[in-house]
C-alpha cells in the first residue's frame, strides 16, 4: 500500500490491515513519505482510533529496524511509559529502575529526551553523569553486570528521524507516543507500561501479547498519571499466561498515604535529579512512596515476587538498605569508563 492510499483509507475511518500498516511504516521509516504525508496519516489514525493490529504492525517494523541489544536470562524488565500525561512529575519510572535492579531484576530502561514533560529519562540520567551513547555490547554488559542499562532511543531507532519534525509541529499525541514502550531494542518480555489514557490499558496489553511479551502491567491512574499513583486509584491491565485481567489498586492497600501528585511536579532537570537522588537515599517523602509503588510493580512483573504487594515490600527494603543508590553510582562509573 502506498502512503496516499493509506491516507484515503484512514480519513474515511477505515482500519488498515496488519500487512497494510507494515507497508506504510516501512515507507515512513525509509524516508519515502513527506512530512505532510506523515502528519496526515498520524492525524487520520488518531481521529479514527488506532487498532491493536495497526499498533502491533507498526511496532514490529520499528523492532525489526532497531539496533538491537542482546540480553538473555530471567527477570528482565522495562519501565518505559508513553508520557504525555501533562503532570510534569519527576522521573518516577527512571528512579524505579535502580530500585528494581537492586532487588535482583535486570532492567533494560528504554527512554528518550523530553517531548512533552519538563524532563525526560535521558535528560535526568545525563545530568546525573551517565553517558547515554553506548554500543549495544556495552549496554548488554551494563544489564548483565549491574542489573540496569539505559537504551537511548535515538541510538537504536535512527529511522524515526523522519517523524520528528511533523510530530513536533503538530504538538499532539500520536501513534508514536504509544510505540515508545512497545519497541525496546532488547525485546524485553516483562514490562510496566504507563499510559496517558485508560482507553489504552487493555489494547496495549494485547499488543504486547502479540509482540511476544509474557508478564506486563499496563497502568493508568484516575488522577491522569501514567504511573501507579499515590494520589488516586490506579487501574491496571495485567497480561500473564496469555490472558489479560483488569483491576484497581489504591495507595492505602500498601500502607501508603494518599497525597496529591502536584507535590511531585518539577520545573527543571536539576530539580528532577535532586528528587531522584533523595528517593534513592531513602529520604521519607511522597516521591519515595510513589517510586516504591512503581518499582514494586516492576519487581512483580519481572517475576521476582509472587504478588504486587510483596514487590512493593521488596522495593521499600532495598531502598532502606541503600542498595538502590549504589546502582546509580555503579552505572555512572561504568558508563564514564566506556
From Swiss-Prot:
Residues annotated as binding 5-phospho-alpha-D-ribose 1-diphosphate: 81, 84-85, 89, 91-94, 109-117, 121
Record-listed Mg(2+) 1 binding positions: 93, 227
Binding residue positions for Mg(2+) 2: 226-227
Gene Ontology terms, MF aspect: anthranilate phosphoribosyltransferase activity; magnesium ion binding
SUPFAM superfamilies noted in UniProt: Nucleoside phosphorylase/phosphoribosyltransferase catalytic domain, Nucleoside phosphorylase/phosphoribosyltransferase N-terminal domain
EC primary class: transferase
One Gene Ontology cellular component annotation held by this UniProt entry: cytosol
Presence of keyword Plastid: no
Binding residues annotated for anthranilate 2, in chain numbering: 167
GO biological process entries: L-tryptophan biosynthetic process
InterPro entries to which the protein is assigned, alphabetical: Anthranilate_Pribosyl_Tfrase (IPR005940), Glycosyl_Trfase_fam3 (IPR000312), Glycosyl_Trfase_fam3_N_dom (IPR017459), Glycosyl_Trfase_fam3_N_dom_sf (IPR036320), Nuc_phospho_transferase (IPR035902)
Cofactor section: Mg(2+)
Keyword annotations: Amino-acid biosynthesis, Aromatic amino acid biosynthesis, Glycosyltransferase, Magnesium, Metal-binding, Transferase, Tryptophan biosynthesis
Biological role stated in the UniProt entry: Catalyzes the transfer of the phosphoribosyl group of 5-phosphorylribose-1-pyrophosphate (PRPP) to anthranilate to yield N-(5'-phosphoribosyl)-anthranilate (PRA).
Family statement drawn from the similarity comment of this UniProt entry: Belongs to the anthranilate phosphoribosyltransferase family.
Subunit structure: Homodimer.
PANTHER family: ANTHRANILATE PHOSPHORIBOSYLTRANSFERASE
Listed name of the protein: Anthranilate phosphoribosyltransferase
Species assigned in the record: Nitrosococcus oceani (strain ATCC 19707 / BCRC 17464 / JCM 30415 / NCIMB 11848 / C-107)
Amino acid at each position: 500500500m502506498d502512503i496516499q492510499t493509506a491516507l484515503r483509507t484512514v480519513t474515511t475511518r477505515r482500519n488498515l490491515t496488519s500487512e497494510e500498516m507494515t507497508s506504510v511504516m516501512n515507507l515512513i521509516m525509509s524516508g519515502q513519505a513527506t512530512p505532510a504525508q506523515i502528519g496526515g496519516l498520524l492525524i487520520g489514525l488518531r481521529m479514527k482510533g488506532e487498532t491493536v493490529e495497526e499498533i502491533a504492525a507498526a511496532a514490529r517494523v520499528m523492532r525489526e529496524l532497531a539496533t538491537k541489544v542482546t540480553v538473555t536470562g530471567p527477570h528482565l524488565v522495562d519501565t518505559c511509559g508513553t508520557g504525555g500525561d501533562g503532570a510534569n512529575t519527576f522521573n518516577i519510572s527512571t528512579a524505579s529502575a535502580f530500585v528494581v535492579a537492586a532487588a535482583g531484576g535486570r532492567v533494560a530502561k528504554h527512554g528518550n529526551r523530553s517531548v512533552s514533560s519538563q524532563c525526560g529519562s535521558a535528560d535526568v540520567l545525563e545530568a546525573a553523569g551517565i553517558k547515554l551513547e553506548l554500543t549495544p555490547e556495552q549496554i548488554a554488559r551494563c544489564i548483565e553486570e549491574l542489573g540496569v542499562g539505559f537504551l537511548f532511543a535515538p541510538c537504536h531507532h535512527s529511522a524515526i528521524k523522519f517523524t520528528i519534525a511533523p510530530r513536533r509541529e503538530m504538538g499532539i499525541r500520536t501513534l508514536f507516543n504509544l510505540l515508545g514502550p512497545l519497541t525496546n531494542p532488547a525485546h524485553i518480555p516483562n514490562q510496566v507500561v504507563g499510559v496517558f489514557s485508560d482507553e489504552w490499558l487493555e489494547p496495549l496489553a494485547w499488543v504486547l501479547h502479540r509482540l511476544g511479551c509474557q508478564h506486563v502491567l499496563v497502568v493508568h491512574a484516575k488522577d491522569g498519571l501514567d504511573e501507579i499513583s499515590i494520589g488516586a486509584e490506579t487501574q491496571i491491565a495485567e497480561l500473564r499466561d496469555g490472558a489479560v485481567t483488569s483491576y484497581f489498586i489504591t495507595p492505602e492497600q500498601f500502607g501508603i498515604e494518599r497525597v496529591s501528585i502536584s507535590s511531585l511536579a518539577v520545573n527543571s532537570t536539576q530539580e528532577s535529579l535532586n528528587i531522584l537522588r533523595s528517593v534513592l537515599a531513602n529520604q521519607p517523602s511522597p516521591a519515595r512512596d510513589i517510586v516504591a509503588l512503581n518499582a514494586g510493580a516492576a519487581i512483580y512483573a519481572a517475576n521476582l515476587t509472587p504478588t504486587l504487594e510483596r514487590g512493593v515490600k521488596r522495593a521499600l527494603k532495598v531502598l532502606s538498605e541503600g542498595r538502590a543508590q549504589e546502582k546509580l553510582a555503579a552505572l555512572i562509573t561504568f558508563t564514564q569508563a566506556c
